[in-house]
Amino acid sequence: KAREMIQELYRYYNRHANRMPKEYLELIDQKAQPQERVVCDYIAGMTDQYAIDRFAEIFIPKAWRG
């Protein structure tokens, strides 16, 4: 399940890079690194709980959350 969650976050942030923090967007804008690498770095820097929270915020309808 964790792998699938990370894969979904990766796909999401590759399609919606503008949802990442400003410092990551600047790396993409400056062409310092390819977007795919920046997305990987962003996700790799997440704590487990932060990744779970982002996943829930993005993919789980609010009415389903407790």
What are these regions, as identified by a protein language model?
Residues 1-66:
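Histidine-centered, transition-metal-coordinating active-site segments
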